[in-house]
Swiss-Prot record:
Gene that encodes the chain: dcd3B
Listed transmembrane segments: 34-54, 77-97, 104-124, 141-161, 166-186, 200-220, 236-256
Membrane topology, as annotated: Multi-pass membrane protein
Name of this protein: Putative alkaline ceramidase dcd3B
UniProt enzyme class: hydrolase
Cystine bridges: none
Residue positions the entry lists as glycosylated: N131
Major subcellular location class: membrane
Species of origin: Dictyostelium discoideum (Social amoeba)
Compartments where located: Membrane
InterPro entries, A to Z: ACER (IPR008901)
PANTHER family the UniProt entry points to: ALKALINE CERAMIDASE 3 (PTHR46187), ALKALINE CERAMIDASE DCD3B-RELATED (PTHR46187:SF2)
GO cellular component annotations of the record: endoplasmic reticulum membrane
Length: 285
């Protein structure tokens, strides 16, 4: 009967979230979780917009993009924001259907985005051909291939083994732990100034705060869900979507700001509708 009523048929994903299925529309399994996923995409698209500006009307942004091109980090940033945007699209497909094939469309971009963040944090420091060891230079050369292989192996594994969410959770968790650890090591080693005087630290702390609240929302819903809600009228998984999108946006801004200051550029925060982004300008020496 459910196959006849619901457009996508019976959900076959091993995970069902708190929001009740097909309550608002027979075409969308989890209505609020579906549309909140596009907030993640919106943050990715906004980040791409900031990197694509070629208008001289906004001189600060125009110069910022020019500096990014000179430092040869613009392509990395564009790819990071593109992968973040795809996470939102994949998540929307998944929550709209709760089909396993679309769950993979959600999980593959998550792995790709997290691995891209690891790549970014490991490549803030430029390779020093004179002083860096041969082992380090070899690692930097093969780093993209190592991370790509990791993502491919995990993708193949979760495609074959359907009923074991722990595989994705542990694999993705390892990338997130790596991001946290590497970011901590970088800030401890290179960012000695207090947080109020350090723009990279500000972005990193904004990222941590967003991700922390997002995780609390996710965990609370998983543990305390009752009849489709924890708090009546509030979908905490939708809050998770919005804040993880924001955290991803801020992490990339942390990377950009760190690169700019590493190369001697000054930075400032630009606030637009409550969202901060960086602008790089003149050399500080």
């Amino acid at each position: 009967m459910e196959n006849e009523i619901n457009y996508w048929g019976v959900p076959d994903s091993p995970i069902d979230w708190c929001e009740e299925n097909y309550i608002i529309s027979k075409y969308i399994c989890e209505f609020y979780n579906t549309f909140s996923s596009f907030i993640i995409t919106a943050f990715g698209v906004y980040g791409i917009f900031l990197m694509m500006s070629a208008s001289s009307r906004d001189q600060a942004l125009f110069q910022h993009v020019k500096i990014m091109k000179e430092l040869k980090i613009r392509q990395k940033v564009l790819f990071s924001y593109l992968s973040l945007a795809i996470v939102g699209v994949g998540s929307a497909f998944y929550h709209a259907t709760l089909l396993y094939k679309n769950q993979l469309f959600d999980e593959f971009p998550m792995m790709l985005t997290a691995s891209m963040f690891v790549y970014c944090i490991l490549t803030i420091d430029p390779v020093d051909e004179k002083n860096d060891t041969a082992t380090y230079k070899l690692m930097r050369r093969f780093l993209p291939y190592i991370l790509s292989l990791y993502v491919i192996v995990v993708a193949i594994t979760i495609t074959i083994i359907r009923d074991s969410p722990i595989i994705l959770q542990s694999s993705f968790g390892l990338l997130i732990f790596s991001n946290v650890f590497l970011s901590y090591m970088y800030t401890s080693r290179c960012l000695k100034t207090p947080v109020m005087e350090s723009n990279p630290k500000k972005f990193l702390y904004l990222c941590i705060a967003s991700m922390g609240i997002a995780y609390i929302s996710w965990l609370t819903e998983r543990k305390l869900c009752n009849n489709g809600y924890v708090i009546p009228g509030v979908q905490l998984h939708a809050v998770w979507h919005a804040l993880t999108g924001l955290a991803g946006f801020y992490y990339i801004q942390f990377f950009i700001t760190s690169c700019l200051e590493k190369h001697g550029y000054k930075t400032k925060l630009n606030w637009n509708y409550g969202i901060a982004s960086v602008r790089g300008f003149i050399k500080s020496y």
